[in-house]
């Protein structure tokens, strides 16, 4: 009985000591505000390259790094969009990456529906000789960003944007979706959001196939589906705000 009591006491003391050590460690406030060092990791279509966004220092902007997938120890290609900040990217082909970027241009909202950031985009063309790799600005990629690539049509991507007036202010938060040719800079409207349907997603041929909505009368989010050769949207799922079930679409 004495041995049992001694063992229990020893375990309690060890637990208290370890708890004191953990509670005694102080983290500076900056640590809690840090963004993820590495994000957006993805592989090129041919599996030969790995790209990611990496933050090298606490207050630094993300840098796009491209590695040789067969030799990750090899020095990667690095690129930033200074003075802009890369926020997302997509592989278009084995040697082309499109990305969207933002830049803080004002300290407070200036006018109706005008934020502190301005948005743009670019396309990076990789070369076997990293010094010959280059990128150019895609002015049509704005706040709505890049929605999807189109692997069957490598010169095209789907982008979205918000209608603006002559002063540059956003008039509506219902996005317009365009099929954008990255070679010629031309774009064609595919569809527009409505008050009922937003976050439209597309298939490999740029056909609108799914969307999201919300019905306040029944306090539920709605999932919409549209067949490939149809213009009719159908509700395939209603989910009340009190329902925490998770689900996702696998394909079309």
Tell where the protein language model's regions lie, with residue ranges.
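Bacterial N-terminal signal peptides
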Residues: 9-18
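Beta-propeller folds
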Residues: 24-252
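Bacterial N-terminal signal peptides that target proteins for export
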Residues: 1-9
């Amino acid at each position: 009985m004495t041995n049992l009591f001694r063992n229990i006491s020893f375990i309690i003391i060890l637990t208290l000591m370890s708890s004191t050590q953990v509670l005694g460690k102080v983290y500076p406030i900056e640590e809690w505000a840090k963004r993820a060092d590495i994000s957006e990791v993805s592989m090129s279509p041919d599996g030969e390259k790995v790209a990611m966004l990496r933050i090298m220092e606490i207050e630094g902007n993300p840098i796009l790094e491209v590695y040789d997938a067969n030799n990750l120890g090899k020095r990667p290609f690095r690129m930033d969009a200074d003075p802009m900040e890369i926020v997302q990217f997509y592989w278009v082909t084995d040697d082309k990456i499109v990305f969207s970027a933002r830049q803080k241009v004002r300290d407070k909202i200036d006018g109706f529906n005008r934020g502190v950031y301005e948005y743009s985009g670019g396309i990076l063309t990789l070369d076997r000789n990293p010094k010959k790799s280059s990128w150019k600005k895609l002015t049509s990629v704005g706040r709505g960003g890049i929605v999807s690539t189109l692997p069957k049509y490598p010169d095209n991507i789907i982008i979205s944007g918000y209608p603006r007036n002559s002063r540059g202010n956003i008039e509506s938060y219902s996005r317009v979706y365009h099929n954008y040719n990255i070679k010629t800079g031309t774009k064609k409207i595919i569809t527009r959001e409505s008050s009922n349907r937003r976050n439209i997603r597309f298939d490999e041929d740029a056909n609108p196939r799914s969307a999201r909505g919300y019905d306040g009368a029944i306090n539920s989010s709605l999932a919409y589906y549209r067949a490939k050769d149809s213009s009719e949207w159908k509700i395939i799922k209603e989910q009340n705000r009190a329902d925490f079930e998770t689900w996702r679409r696998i394909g079309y």
